[in-house]
Amino acid sequence: MGAMAYSLLFCLLLAHLGLGEVGASLDPPGRPDSPRERTPRGKQHGQQLPRASAPDPSIPWSRSTDGTILAQKLAEEVPVDVASYLYTGDFHQLKRANCSGRYELAGLPGKSPSLASSHPSLHGALDTLTHATNFLNMMLQSNKSREQTVQDDLQWYQALVRSLLEGEPSISRAAITFSTESLSTPAPQVFLQATREESRILLQDLSSSAHHLANATLETEWFHGLRRKWRPHLHRRGSNQGPRGLGHSWRRRDGLGGDRSHVKWSPPYLECENGSYKPGWLVTLSAAFYGLQPNLVPEFRGVMKVDISLQKVDIDQCSSDGWFSGTHKCHLNNSECMPIKGLGFVLGAYQCICKAGFYHPRVFSVNNFQRRGPDHHFSGSTKDVSEETHVCLPCREGCPFCADDRPCFVQEDKYLRLAIISFQALCMLLDFVSMLVVYHFRKAKSIRASGLILLETILFGSLLLYFPVVILYFEPSTFRCILLRWARLLGFATVYGTVTLKLHRVLKVFLSRTAQRIPYMTGGRVMRMLAVIVLVVFWFLVGWTSSMCQNLERDILLVGQGQTSDHLTFNMCLIDRWDYMTAVAEFLFLLWGIYLCYAVRTVPSAFHEPRYMAVAVHNELIITAIFHTIRFVLASRLQPDWMLMLYFAHAHLTVTVTIGLLLIPKFSHSSNNPRDDIATEAYEDELDMGRSGSYLNSSINSAWSEHSLDPEDIRDELKKLYAQLEIYKRKKMITNNPHLQKKRCSKKGLGRSIMRRITEIPETVSRQCSKEDKEGTDHSAAKGTGLVRKNPTESSGNTGRPKEESLKNRVFSLKKSHSTYDHVRDQTVESSSLPMESQEEEATENSTLESLSSKKLTQKLKEDSEAESTESVPLVCKSASAHNLSSEKKPGHPRTSMLQKSLSVIASAKEKTLGLAGKTQTLVMEDRAKSQKPKDRETIRKYSNSDNVETIPNSGHMEEPRKPQKSGIMKQQRVSLPTANPDVSSGITQIKDNFDIGEVCPWEVYDLTPGPMPSEPKAQKHVSIAASEVEQNPASFLKEKSYHKSKATEGLYQANHKSIDKTEVCPWEIHSQSLLEDENRLISKTPVLPGRAREENGSQLYTTNMCAGQYEELPHKVVAPKVENENLNQMGDQEKQTSSSVDIIPGSCNSSNNSHQPLTSRAEVCPWEFEPLEQPNAERSVTLPASSALSANKIPGPQK
């Protein structure tokens, strides 16, 4: 019967627990009460508020959170063994302590769990006690229970106490007291207790010993504390409706009840058993239950309590409520308190963790909790009881985390960085000063050879390339990291884009394999191409910057942290994939530059600028490759000082070296005399190249350096170009000299048509002409040479040798030509000699060219005399660009500068000079033909043949020592010339007295104005890139040898071995001057008959002017040597007696033009030049106008 009652009671208790949980969920504490219950409940709360505000003596915990108070109380009030057990949890020390009663931890700081949320491990026991109390309240408040006695319900109470231990394992003991009279008897009538002993539950009835509960002690506080305040804090869930209504309310679970707040908590305590403390801390939870009187007034009936073991309950000293709450010793300003779980009911189960930016002075102490060992005895001193103060020290500045006082960030070397930035600022200042210096010397040849705008652009880009070092001096930021890419890429594109485009321009202009003019790349065009490159780089940088800004919105930072091998951190600009792409782009661009350097390696240039640019590009490629490799591999481990030095070294090994390679040679050459380089190399200056033909010179050299081309093709191309240059020269001459158009010629239109036909010669005809020159030189050269030299001393025995001379002159003029600009001054001769093989067109062409040449004779002689004083170096073989540079200093002469370095031009000049000599001899022989015998001419011819036979073998002997000088640089020697013949001046005076040239040729008055007196030239160097003397001028050399043989007393043969005389370099120069003097003397002594000039000497007059017209195309200083001049004078005297003027004159004039056809009379071409016979003075002036003008300009010649 008892077992069934226990089981039934347990089932009812479980059911009540379930219904109570449902009721609690349906009626939460915060739900507003009904209007009927609001007033009395307000009174109950009004009565409870003063109690809550007053200190409750039953609560042993203070709200103080000071850990020092806890340590002091533990040292002063708590026994040593108990305190040691509280800190260590070692029960062996507790057994050695003696006791007379239980020990409670009362009056210690902390909050009671009853006033706040308790420990989670106590929630089960608390809920079990609350539901059991509410079950008793409902049982005692029913009608039936009120009629029954306590003895009848004893079994039910025993079953209830037993069920508490079985339902919650944390409860070690449960008890219930019951009294029928609430206040009349101090002790309860029933006292039932159930105890857990190992695996079984012991149920005891202690009603007989319940009288000890009447005494108020610490052990009975759980009963007397609830009895003293018998009015419970409970509320009626239903209205008072009498017994019937109460039963109805029971069925509706209405009535008086309690919750967790009605449970009383005792402080932790130790039980004393047999004079010693029982191991294990306990806490008692108690709650009262009430019944109803007959008048339905609540009355106290009893108390139910449970004892809970705390050995598995952790003390949280870091929390704000609970036992020992807030008693930690962590400094909240630099550390955080973190509880340690699973240690049980012991103190100090926490650790102080240093906050970010702080560290503990002892590296191996991570917290201030130290579990004491079992053999450790609590001494009772404050030092041992209290927990050691956990102090966290701040880290070094800038360190978010640290373990000790060592710096976590890399310490920068301030002095090193200051020295680097100072030197970098100095270099940037020097770069800016260099821009000003280059602009100041913008008119210098060295600066103009490279281009002022391009040099300034390179220097400006260098400033941008210097900026990354300045940016890295400061702390990295997002803006500085973006600016770093902008400065690097824009500077690289500007500097090396300009250098590469300059090399590209050299490749385009100098390495053209055709003689056709290509579009010239001026500085403006190069800048436009550079603008395209810079625009592409700028567009990429804009896109990259916008993507970086978008990444910042996605929390993708551009600035990160690196760590060195010493575990020191530093801020750095992160490297992304775009940096790799830009490095590859730089590498490919530099490879293109290296290809251009290889392509232009054979191109000569003033100051060797392409060579220095090639060195700069190769240097940039190598240094940049090393720089990017180190940067990409070691960037995250390279500290800022090393990174700054890396950028510094990269900037100066590339940018500074490039600036030095471009500027230092220019200013170093400016102090020396660069004529050697100017003579052998071509300028790259955009100004000169736009006006000169030196680019063709370089293209010819490059073409000859590649032997894959056929010389015949090059010769054909040159012939076409010469014809085009002749037209250009004539147009420019007429444009700059409008007065030349006043003297019109009836054959002018015919001459223009012939010149147009010359320029349109097909390629096949040109090749046929060149082949005929090689195959049929015996016919043309022998005949032309014989006509030239029909004088007693040179005419015989010269038919074979001139053929070889003509062939050599043609070949060497092509091989050794260094500038096609030289031929611009001599296009009249070249263009007239192009169609020589066409026998039918020669007469018409020569007449047209003679008419044009006769108009410009005086004008050319005046310009040649002026050029003699303005050009510092006579016959300097320098590039056309250098001539343009020198000619720009003399803007008053709108003419082409003097050039003479091509051997082909030198050879043609020699032949024209000999033709002029023949013309002069013709005038002399005309007056002496009547008195001369024919046999004398035969005698002189034999003498000439014998002389030439002796000269030819000696020419081979003289050729050998002169071969090493074929392409070398020869120094011009100063040669003194004899003074002018007084007969010439007398002849000129006589001519001026006889007639007034203004009356006959008023358009030539301006041309007869004598030019400035040429100053004596200094001994200067010039370049002669030519073959030996015999190869370039064999006829002149033979004549010179013959003269040396006949005039051995003068000692000129020995002088030629000691030093190179001017007669060897330019043997035609002195000869021309002597011929002009003899011509003037003959003009003054020999009268001209008008009738004879019309009838017999018509062709002779034309020939004389024709030769003079051709002579205007020669440079002013191309004259015959003195030795040959004297020889010609002797031959002229003999020719007066032996030769016939009618037979000699055509040959002498045609020899210079290689022509064999009869010429048109001058009277037919220019009939207005011949006046009636009644004007002898005018007729005389018309006969030799060119000779008169030539004599007038040649009398005040320079003394050399």
UniProtKB/Swiss-Prot annotation:
<feature type="cross-link" description="Glycyl lysine isopeptide (Lys-Gly) (interchain with G-Cter in ubiquitin)">
    <location>
        <position position="774"/>
    </location>
</feature>
<keyword id="KW-0807">Transducer</keyword>
<feature type="transmembrane region" description="Helical; Name=2">
    <location>
        <begin position="452"/>
        <end position="474"/>
    </location>
</feature>
<feature type="topological domain" description="Cytoplasmic">
    <location>
        <begin position="502"/>
        <end position="525"/>
    </location>
</feature>
<dbReference type="GO" id="GO:0050807">
    <property type="term" value="P:regulation of synapse organization"/>
</dbReference>
<dbReference type="GO" id="GO:0160079">
    <property type="term" value="F:G protein-coupled glycine receptor activity"/>
</dbReference>
<dbReference type="GO" id="GO:0042734">
    <property type="term" value="C:presynaptic membrane"/>
</dbReference>
<feature type="transmembrane region" description="Helical; Name=5">
    <location>
        <begin position="577"/>
        <end position="597"/>
    </location>
</feature>
<keyword id="KW-0628">Postsynaptic cell membrane</keyword>
<dbReference type="InterPro" id="IPR017978">
    <property type="entry name" value="GPCR_3_C"/>
</dbReference>
<dbReference type="GO" id="GO:0042995">
    <property type="term" value="C:cell projection"/>
</dbReference>
<keyword id="KW-1015">Disulfide bond</keyword>
<feature type="modified residue" description="Phosphoserine">
    <location>
        <position position="944"/>
    </location>
</feature>
<feature type="compositionally biased region" description="Basic and acidic residues">
    <location>
        <begin position="769"/>
        <end position="781"/>
    </location>
</feature>
<feature type="transmembrane region" description="Helical; Name=1">
    <location>
        <begin position="418"/>
        <end position="439"/>
    </location>
</feature>
<keyword id="KW-0597">Phosphoprotein</keyword>
<keyword id="KW-0472">Membrane</keyword>
<keyword id="KW-1003">Cell membrane</keyword>
<feature type="region of interest" description="Disordered">
    <location>
        <begin position="234"/>
        <end position="253"/>
    </location>
</feature>
<keyword id="KW-0675">Receptor</keyword>
<feature type="region of interest" description="Disordered">
    <location>
        <begin position="1177"/>
        <end position="1200"/>
    </location>
</feature>
<feature type="topological domain" description="Extracellular">
    <location>
        <begin position="25"/>
        <end position="417"/>
    </location>
</feature>
<dbReference type="GO" id="GO:0098839">
    <property type="term" value="C:postsynaptic density membrane"/>
</dbReference>
<comment type="subunit">
    <text>Homodimer. Associates with the RGS7-GNB5 complex, promoting its localization to the cell membrane and regulating its GTPase activator activity. Interacts (via VCPWE motifs) with GNAO1. Interacts with GPC4. Interacts with EGFLAM.</text>
</comment>
<feature type="short sequence motif" description="VCPWE motif 3">
    <location>
        <begin position="1165"/>
        <end position="1169"/>
    </location>
</feature>
<feature type="glycosylation site" description="N-linked (GlcNAc...) asparagine">
    <location>
        <position position="98"/>
    </location>
</feature>
<feature type="transmembrane region" description="Helical; Name=7">
    <location>
        <begin position="643"/>
        <end position="664"/>
    </location>
</feature>
<feature type="compositionally biased region" description="Polar residues">
    <location>
        <begin position="1178"/>
        <end position="1191"/>
    </location>
</feature>
<dbReference type="GO" id="GO:0004888">
    <property type="term" value="F:transmembrane signaling receptor activity"/>
</dbReference>
<dbReference type="GO" id="GO:0001956">
    <property type="term" value="P:positive regulation of neurotransmitter secretion"/>
</dbReference>
<feature type="topological domain" description="Extracellular">
    <location>
        <begin position="475"/>
        <end position="478"/>
    </location>
</feature>
<feature type="disulfide bond">
    <location>
        <begin position="99"/>
        <end position="272"/>
    </location>
</feature>
<feature type="modified residue" description="Phosphoserine">
    <location>
        <position position="1074"/>
    </location>
</feature>
<comment type="function">
    <text>Metabotropic receptor for glycine that controls synapse formation and function in the brain. Acts as an atypical G-protein coupled receptor that recruits and regulates the RGS7-GNB5 complex instead of activating G proteins. In absence of glycine ligand, promotes the GTPase activator activity of RGS7, increasing the GTPase activity of G protein alpha subunits, thereby driving them into their inactive GDP-bound form.</text>
</comment>
<dbReference type="GO" id="GO:0050890">
    <property type="term" value="P:cognition"/>
</dbReference>
<feature type="transmembrane region" description="Helical; Name=4">
    <location>
        <begin position="526"/>
        <end position="547"/>
    </location>
</feature>
<feature type="compositionally biased region" description="Polar residues">
    <location>
        <begin position="973"/>
        <end position="988"/>
    </location>
</feature>
<feature type="binding site">
    <location>
        <position position="173"/>
    </location>
    <ligand>
        <name>glycine</name>
    </ligand>
</feature>
<dbReference type="Pfam" id="PF00003">
    <property type="entry name" value="7tm_3"/>
</dbReference>
<feature type="signal peptide">
    <location>
        <begin position="1"/>
        <end position="24"/>
    </location>
</feature>
<dbReference type="InterPro" id="IPR054714">
    <property type="entry name" value="GPR158_179_extracellular"/>
</dbReference>
<feature type="topological domain" description="Extracellular">
    <location>
        <begin position="548"/>
        <end position="576"/>
    </location>
</feature>
